[in-house]
Amino acid sequence: MDSTLSRRGFIASGLGAAAGALLAPRRSAGAASDRFLIVNADDLGLSAEVDRGLFEAHDAGIVTSASLLVDGPDVEAAIQQARLRPKLGIGIHVSFDDRGKLFTDMQDLAAVQQQIDRQLAAFIRMVGSPPDHIDSHHHMHRLFNVARLFLVAGRRYNVPVRGFSDVVFVGRFYGQPEFGKADLSKISVEVLVAMLRAVKPGVTEISCHPGYAESRPDAIYDREREVELRTLTDEQVKKTISEEGIRLISYRDYNRMSRDAR
């Protein structure tokens, strides 16, 4: 979730050459003027309520990709439902405990590496194939000291790591610009339509968190999920995508396009 970047203060902006050495730019097929959009929903497997909303957004024709929490309480049911939707791309949403709460000691790189390896192995075992992209809960993979570990994993499986490929990441569609403080105006139809109209040629990802409110009292991002779901499935959003000539794709499609362009 985007607010973590600002409150943690460890954005991986200084990786520069190191990141480039590990993960060369991936060139996508298509005309230079083509506008491709990945709409990726985080937190698949977190709960039955979240998963229900996520799948509704996919079934409505807007969400094209999802990031799976392999330690999520609803992960097995989520995978079963995802198999019924072959057009939905699935990546991994690496977390550092069973509900994705912030890991207290990200300086322990051996422990971080162990978690990355364990969760990737679990993903392959449960899903039956590697993820089509790698990211993390609360964007922890962008922390300067651990970003390299994620980049190595991306290179190992030849898949993009969110924020370290030529996919332009747009994370502003989020209802808590300050952690714990809801601002539903940030996830309105008007805001999303403006984002869509601003999509440039190439490949862009808009991150989202659709779902239904959970019954547990400790849910951090809850009613915002339902607002996101309503916004994503609004007819004006679909109309704008069509009018703008935006082509919706998944990370799986992006990977195939990148291979074809080589």
Regions found by a protein language model. Give the residues of each.
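A short alpha/beta connector and helix-capping loop motif
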Residues: 48-72
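Structural preference for beta-strand elements that scaffold enzyme active sites
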Residues: 36-38, 63-65, 87-91, 131-133, ...
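C-terminal domain-boundary segment and adjacent tail
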Residues: 219-262
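Active-site beta-loop-alpha junctions enriched in small/polar residues
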Residues: 42-44, 69-71, 93-99, 137-139, ...
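Acidic (Asp/Glu)-rich catalytic clusters
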Residues: 54-59, 77-91, 124-125
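C-terminal segment of N-terminal export signals and the immediately downstream linker at the start
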Residues: 24-40, 45
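Catalytic domains of cell-wall/extracellular-matrix polysaccharide-remodeling enzymes
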Residues: 120-199
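N-terminal secretory signal peptides and thylakoid transit peptides that target proteins
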Residues: 1-18
